Amino acid sequence: MRRKLLFMILSFLFFFAIIFTLKCFSEEAATFVPKNYVIAYYFHGTFRCPTCHKLEQYSKEAIEANFKNELTSGKIVFKTVNVDEKANEHFVNDYQLYTRSLVISLVRGGKEEKFKNLTKIWEYVGNKQRFYDYVWDEIAAFLKEL
């Protein structure tokens, strides 16, 4: 009888310790999510021409090359979104999209405060460095507002 009671008590304590540990880890993980950040969306359709692929590639490269720390910390998030998919159609109206686009969005306290469609990516796609500089300047300006 004593062994059963001891086993039950130890089992309860072990179970309680596991629950407590998991709760601590989940709270710790939640603290690493920044409340203020910049999202860089590259919007495309299902059909993608070579220039569209290049726009996405340059956008991603410009952000990864210039903002490694911010990407790692979550201050910048890069997302590629197909607006032809039903779940993503709202972005066309949300950001007044009329073509393939790179849009940056400033989020504070979990709410979008402002956004900017970087329309000059089409103008600069033929000059990689100018493209990178343009994307860097625009994102850096948004980061200053965090």
Explain the meaning of each model-derived region.
Residues I9-F20:
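Bacterial N-terminal signal peptides
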Residues C24-S26:
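Boundary at the C-terminal end of the N-terminal hydrophobic targeting segment
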Residues V33-A65:
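Local sequence-structure signature of Cys/Sec-based thiol-disulfide redox active-site neighborhoods
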Residues L71-A87:
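Thiol-based oxidoreductase modules, predominantly thioredoxin-like and allied folds used
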Residues A87, V92-V107, E113:
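Structural micro-motif
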Residues I104-L146:
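Non-catalytic, surface beta->alpha helical segment in thiol-disulfide oxidoreductase systems
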